[in-house]
């Protein structure tokens, strides 16, 4: 019998936006001390959120939960102008860890709205990123999730249309919705550059290319992570066994066979530590070997929020 083989996908795990957001929260806690309030989860990963709670971060869903004058960090998913104004009204010391690729979508929404366009936003209702983007121009944005939503759209003749997308969508799903939009509204404007982020695309590409050789696919990530859910869906497309788990604590020995070929990847908000602990669990239980498959190299970094850059430099110099 051939022993278990782990196919370790690369790239996987943290993207540049998540790295920046996590570094920002770490530095904010060091600079100001706890408690540091974070509007929504810093990233959609339960392990990361638990770790920061233990360090003194407090995750809130409304600005009213933050004491006046408190320190507040906006998460990687971005916020609406209304939230920024509410933070100012409470005299909060607000820092912004919004991913620059999300900010790009916000700026596109503002630009199109000012030019008189109706914006069709492709995304998941209720997702933090979607709420922030829609808040930039609520009177001008219509949300769609799939082709059926597109088929229900009706606009006055002569309406100028543009579309934008949530950054963490399935490339294939978004492509189908965009094709339907173009069929129904041939004059619709598209963003100058694809809104789906590089890391989302790269991780999906790796799963597509590597799933053929796998019997089972394990995606490390949390259930509320949009990009992790899309990876699981992609993994399961051809009838393969696919699971989305936070770590080895969610796995059972009877889910695997001794000779399985197990593809492991991780969503953009899942830390490498949970990948390694999952590999260790499979090695311990199945004597598995690891074969890393690099599909694409990544070397992207995003700058910290300006108020943290000098402090970060001081901390680095002191080491």
Curated annotation (Swiss-Prot):
Active-site residue list: 129 (proton donor)
Enzyme Commission number(s) of this protein: 1.17.7.4
Annotated binding of isopentenyl diphosphate, by residue: 44, 77, 127, 225-227, 269
GO biological process, one term: isopentenyl diphosphate biosynthetic process, methylerythritol 4-phosphate pathway
Domain of life where this protein originates: Bacteria
Cofactor note: Binds 1 [4Fe-4S] cluster per subunit.
Pathway noted in the entry: Isoprenoid biosynthesis; dimethylallyl diphosphate biosynthesis; dimethylallyl diphosphate from (2E)-4-hydroxy-3-methylbutenyl diphosphate: step 1/1; Isoprenoid biosynthesis; isopentenyl diphosphate biosynthesis via DXP pathway; isopentenyl diphosphate from 1-deoxy-D-xylulose 5-phosphate: step 6/6
Binding site for [4Fe-4S] cluster: 15, 99, 197
Entry binding sites for (2E)-4-hydroxy-3-methylbut-2-enyl diphosphate: 44, 77, 127, 167, 225-227, 269
Catalysis: reaction(s): isopentenyl diphosphate + 2 oxidized [2Fe-2S]-[ferredoxin] + H2O = (2E)-4-hydroxy-3-methylbut-2-enyl diphosphate + 2 reduced [2Fe-2S]-[ferredoxin] + 2 H(+); dimethylallyl diphosphate + 2 oxidized [2Fe-2S]-[ferredoxin] + H2O = (2E)-4-hydroxy-3-methylbut-2-enyl diphosphate + 2 reduced [2Fe-2S]-[ferredoxin] + 2 H(+)
Keywords from the named record: 4Fe-4S, Iron, Iron-sulfur, Isoprene biosynthesis, Metal-binding, Oxidoreductase
GO cellular component, one term: cytosol
Example GO molecular function: 4 iron, 4 sulfur cluster binding
Positions with a binding annotation for dimethylallyl diphosphate: 44, 77, 127, 225-227, 269
Signal peptide (residue range): none
Function: Catalyzes the conversion of 1-hydroxy-2-methyl-2-(E)-butenyl 4-diphosphate (HMBPP) into a mixture of isopentenyl diphosphate (IPP) and dimethylallyl diphosphate (DMAPP). Acts in the terminal step of the DOXP/MEP pathway for isoprenoid precursor biosynthesis.
Family in the record: Belongs to the IspH family.
Name of the protein in its database record: 4-hydroxy-3-methylbut-2-enyl diphosphate reductase
Organism whose genome encodes this protein: Rhodopirellula baltica (strain DSM 10527 / NCIMB 13988 / SH1)
Name of the coding gene: ispH
């Amino acid at each position: 019998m051939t022993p278990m083989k782990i196919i370790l996908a690369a790239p996987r795990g943290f993207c540049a936006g998540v790295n920046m957001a996590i570094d920002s929260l770490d530095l904010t806690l060091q600079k100001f001390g706890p408690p540091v309030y974070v509007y929504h989860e810093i990233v959609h990963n339960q392990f990361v959120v638990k770790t920061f709670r233990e360090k003194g971060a407090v995750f809130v869903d409304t600005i009213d939960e933050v004491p006046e004058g408190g320190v507040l960090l906006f998460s990687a998913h971005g916020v609406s102008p209304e939230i920024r104004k509410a933070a100012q009204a409470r005299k909060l010391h607000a820092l912004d860890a919004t991913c620059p690729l999300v900010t790009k979508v916000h700026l596109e929404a503002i630009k199109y709205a000012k030019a008189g366009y109706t914006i069709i936003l492709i995304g998941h209702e209720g997702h933090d990123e979607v709420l922030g983007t829609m808040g930039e121009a609520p009177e001008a944005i219509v949300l769609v999730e799939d082709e059926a939503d597109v088929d229900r759209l009706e606009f006055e003749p002569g309406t100028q249309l543009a579309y934008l997308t949530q950054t963490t969508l399935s490339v294939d799903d978004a492509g189908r919705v965009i094709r339907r939009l173009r069929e129904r509204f041939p004059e619709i404007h598209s963003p100058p550059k694809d809104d789906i982020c590089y890391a989302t695309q790269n991780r999906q590409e790796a799963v597509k290319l590597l799933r053929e050789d796998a019997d089972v696919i394990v995606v490390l990530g949390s259930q509320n992570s949009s990009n992790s859910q899309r990876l699981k869906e992609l993994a399961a497309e051809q009838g393969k066994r696919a699971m989305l788990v936070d770590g080895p604590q969610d796995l059972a020995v009877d889910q695997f066979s001794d000779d399985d070929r197990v593809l492991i990847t991780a969503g953009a908000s899942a830390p490498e530590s949970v990948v390694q602990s999952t590999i260790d669990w499979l090695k311990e239980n199945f004597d598995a070997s690891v074969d890393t498959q690099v599909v694409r190299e990544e070397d992207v970094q995003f700058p910290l929020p300006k108020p943290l850059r000098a402090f970060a430099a001081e901390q680095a110099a002191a080491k």
